[in-house]
């Protein structure tokens, strides 16, 4: 552990601003094979595991800045998720700059791919954590 006196901090939830929270939450749950979104106040929550929830919220006319969300998945989960990406006819890239269209990367002996959600956020699935990340 590089910081022996550091506190243990876990991400619990984050808000994902969306053009249409229903479309975005349904898209995410569908592509990732997760349970249907659950309403919570003004949000639609999708539980992604590890006690983390993505809380989708309508941006209500505010400009949405693209965010990047990376998910570490098993080889089997990668195949399932990537299969759904291709079934939906989504564009995908090997890089975050979206220059290597239609390719996957093989960083650190794993596989990784980027694709966008309906609001333009860049989603990434990887099978190995990036060293130094």
Predicted regions: what they are:
Residues 40, 67, 109:
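Exposed loop/turn and edge beta-strand positions of beta-sandwich/beta-sheet ligand-binding modules
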């Amino acid at each position: 552990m590089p910081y022996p006196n550091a506190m243990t901090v876990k991400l619990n939830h984050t808000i994902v601003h969306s053009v249409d929270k229903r479309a975005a939450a349904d898209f995410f749950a569908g592509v990732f094979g997760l349970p249907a979104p659950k309403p919570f106040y003004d949000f639609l929550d999708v539980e992604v595991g590890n006690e983390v929830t993505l809380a989708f919220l309508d941006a209500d006319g505010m400009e949405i800045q693209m965010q990047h969300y990376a998910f570490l998945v098993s080889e089997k989960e990668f195949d399932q998720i990537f299969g759904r990406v291709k079934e939906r006819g989504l564009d995908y890239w090997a890089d975050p700059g979206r220059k290597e269209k239609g390719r996957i990367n093989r960083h650190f002996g794993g596989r990784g791919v980027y694709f966008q959600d309906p609001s333009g956020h860049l989603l990434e699935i990887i099978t190995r954590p990036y060293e130094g990340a």
